From Swiss-Prot:
Name listed for the protein in its UniProt record: 4-hydroxyphenylpyruvate dioxygenase
InterPro entries membership: 4OHPhenylPyrv_dOase, 4OHPhenylPyrv_dOase_C, 4OHPhenylPyrv_dOase_N, Glyas_Bleomycin-R_OHBP_Dase, Glyas_Fos-R_dOase_dom, VOC
Alphabetical GO biological process terms: L-phenylalanine catabolic process; tyrosine catabolic process
Catalytic activity: 3-(4-hydroxyphenyl)pyruvate + O2 = homogentisate + CO2
Sequence ranges of Low complexity compositional bias: 7-19
Length: 434
């Protein structure tokens, strides 16, 4: 793992940087600690899909995240099949409905609706249904959210074993789920799930969710709604001028909880550009607002990428094309005091992007869409630096260390634009040939 940076971004070797990296980040350093309820961390992200075993199997293979728990016919659940993948504190849940007429009372997820799940899959393909937060008290989080204008999705329920569960609407058909449970519980996930042991499981080094990004038609009302009922504060903002290309752009804001360990960025499309915004493309193919991408943190993203790329051609995930070699000359000037020459060369070989703010360094890479539609994708990420100590003297990393890749947005946008252009060219050729 690369060492922690010892010099600020604006001094030393990092002072001479490429123009893209030279532009200042609009990072909001003031933390008002304004949460409406005590939010501890991400708990899980749930996908609704047509077949849980198939979807979970592909993600497990691609990410090196083994099956950790299940709830299905084998556990007495005839309403839905759910499979949980886990790596570190990272938890991906995949849920699919069984046939019509099954006993809804056997569901381990109390808010599950087979009819709604079928509509969801038909409307969105494989997509995120629930962004779940671990909170101190799910019932209180629900009540506090409702008092501040949150639209209810599922009222609080006691699951037993000290677990509580509730949901409010987030954006589109996505819900924000509240889960509370005692520390040190021996329940493998939620009551009703059975643990799965796999002594031969692989480990690619994935540790946790870093952030979960939503695409919406209009940023201001969506951000005001979510910030209003959660109390989450603005952590960063970007505009089309900051992060677009000459052909398209977006506006974005990042919301964060008190600890800044839960980060919820939101994007909106910019209209009137040469090309249709990539955010608008998402909204059209997804069928409305939804989760655009999930950033997954790694303790060593270069190792993680070597493992993942080895499986790309065998059913794993594909990655966006790497930037041109000249990009990495800028990386040497930007982060050569933190990354060794061997590490920079490996970043170039693997297509990893590098950025830096005044507190830390960011390594990131993006997959191509993981389903049939050009919508949901993943980001693999490593943050370097920003280490602090809590009141117990234990070291931890500040949330959002190294920023959100503002210096790489133009590179990312160009890569996605090229990918979309290739799809459009093939569609045009197919139409002309018909």
């Amino acid at each position: 793992m690369p060492p922690t940076p010892t010099t600020p971004a604006a001094t030393g070797a990092a002072a001479a940087v490429t123009p893209e990296h030279a532009r200042p980040h609009r990072m909001v350093r003031f933390n008002p600690r304004s949460d409406r309820f005590h939010t501890l961390s991400f708990h899980h992200v749930e996908f609704w899909c047509a077949d849980a075993a198939s979807a979970a199997g592909r993600f497990a293979f691609a990410l090196g995240a083994p099956l950790a728990a299940r709830s299905d016919l084998s556990t007495g659940n005839s309403a839905h099949a759910s499979q949980l993948l886990r790596s570190g504190s990272l938890a991906f849940l995949f849920t699919a409905p069984y046939a019509n007429g099954c006993d809804a009372a056997t569901a381990s997820l109390p808010s599950f609706s087979a009819d709604a799940a079928r509509r969801f899959s038909a409307d969105h393909g494989i997509a995120v249904r629930s962004v779940a937060l671990r909170v101190a008290d799910a019932a209180e989080a629900f009540r506090a959210s409702r008092r501040r204008g949150a639209r209810p999705a599922f009222a609080p329920v006691d699951l037993g074993r000290g677990f509580a569960f509730a949901e409010v609407e987030l954006y589109g058909d996505v819900v924000l789920r509240f889960v509370s449970h005692p520390d040190g519980t021996d329940v493998p996930f939620l009551p009703g799930f059975e643990g799965v042991t796999n002594p031969d499981a692989v480990d690619y080094g994935l540790t946790r969710f870093d952030h979960v990004v939503g695409n919406v038609p209009e940023l201001a009302p969506a951000a005001a709604y979510i910030a209003g009922f959660t109390g989450f504060h603005e952590f960063a903002e970007f505009t089309a001028e900051d992060v677009g290309t000459t052909e398209s752009g977006l506006n974005s804001v990042v919301l964060a909880n008190n600890s800044e360990g839960v980060l919820l960025p939101l994007n909106e499309p910019v209209h009137g550009t040469k090309r249709r915004s990539q955010i608008q493309t998402f909204l059209e193919h997804h069928g409305g607002p939804g989760v655009q991408h999930i950033a997954v943190a790694s303790s060593d993203v270069l190792r993680t990428l070597r493992k993942m790329r080895a499986r790309s051609a065998m059913g794993g995930f594909d990655f966006l094309p790497p930037p041109l070699p000249k990009y990495y000359e800028g990386v040497r000037r930007l982060a050569g005091d933190v990354l060794s020459e061997a590490q920079i060369k490996e970043c170039q070989e693997l297509g990893v992007l590098v950025d830096r703010d005044d507190q830390g360094v960011l390594l990131q890479i993006f997959t191509k869409p993981v389903g049939d539609r050009p919508t949901l994708f993943l980001e693999m990420i490593q943050r370097i630096g920003c280490m602090e100590k809590d009141e117990r003297g234990e070291e931890y990393q500040k949330g959002g260390c190294g920023g959100f890749g503002k210096g790489n947005f133009s590179e990312l946008f160009k890569s996605i634009e090229d990918y979309e252009k290739s799809l459009e060219a093939k569609q045009s050729a197919a139409v002309q040939g018909s």
